[in-house]
Amino acid sequence: MSSVVVVGTQWGDEGKGKITDFLSENAEVIARYQGGNNAGHTIKFDGITYKLHLIPSGIFYKDKTCVIGNGMVVDPKALVTELAYLHERNVSTDNLRISNRAHVILPYHLKLDEVEEERKGANKIGTTKKGIGPAYMDKAARIGIRIADLLDRDAFAEKLERNLEEKNRLLEKMYETEGFKLEDILDEYYEYGQQIKKYVCDTSVVLNDALDEGRRVLFEGAQGVMLDIDQGTYPFVTSSNPVAAVSQSVLVSARPKIKHVVGVSKAYTTRVGDGPFPTELKDEIGDQIREVGREYGTTTGRPPRVGWFDSVVVRHARRVSGITDLSLNSIDVLAGIETLKICVRYRYKGEIIEEFPASLKALAECEPVYEEMPGWTEDITGAKSLSELPENARHYLERVSQLTGIPLSIFSVGPDRSQTNVLRSVYRAN
């Protein structure tokens, strides 16, 4: 059986949750491999909209195993809240598995994220203030607290006390703000651990057994390649690696098991937070796309910046993440725009460049070189195949595929699960 990775090709919010939910129907295990509750997934089916941040999108299928992998950072309070959110809607979570090696986000991570962002002032990154960066910093510094520690009260208390000495000194001396007391955190978070205890296990065993048995595993990335700490618009990035290659290194052994990588894009571009954005629209067309596309971040609620489709960005994502299949979302949002534009390359200091620059300064000075295409006015939200799309819409999809170098496998004409159309199976043998 083929196993598949789903990654975002832009700056997140491309609709990965919807596509993962759709592909979950034919998978047997769905695993998230990085990030935390800074990511937001919106899934809509049967007229109901669900919003998740930590739990994999496949949770709505009772017969699928859903995994929160060891590469994630988990806010136990947020996780317990999300579990309650699902239970209130009669969604079973008995199929959830949580890695005992995933790192824990604690109140001091949230506080440090907030005060550091405030300290940066005009140089702020635009963090979601969910404690993600500080938690990954502790992981790299080898002082992090893991889920396994959270379940052992004595081990948790010992590590928490040691960490609070350092964190309080930092908060009080550098940021001139109040620190935390051990008792403010210990009992509450230990109780959260007890509430999730039944889901906790060694998820590498779950995943390797599934792969060895030939079961279909779907690896679900969060954010997007352009927010990858190595390959994205550093430092305006997240603190982990959304790129597909990391899915194996943080979840399973190094044996090659992934057959296909699905790159999810919008038919335009959005970005939440700061940093250079070459194709950004600051006019009425941008406002129209934002409103028609209901563009507000699932996690932050912030209205994103909006721009034309940037093939330079998606080509970069294809190269660094090994993308084999393109899933293009929100095509319906572009209806009614007379002339559409696609960025095909950049102009930098009078020179044409085809590749995405590593230098943030250079990127900020890049001008997009556009190719114009005629738009369409028809309502395409009911289209079930390429042949049902207007000619101009078909040409737009074909051109995006050509410019990115990625064959189009899925296209979406609305937010509902039923508005997703498959041109070729991503679970194919080769």
UniProtKB/Swiss-Prot annotation:
Pfam families: Adenylsucc_synt
Enzyme Commission identifier(s): 6.3.4.4
Binding site for GTP: 12-18, 40-42, 330-332, 412-414
Assigned protein family: Belongs to the adenylosuccinate synthetase family.
Primary location class: cytoplasm
Superkingdom, taxonomy of origin: Bacteria
Protein name as annotated: Adenylosuccinate synthetase
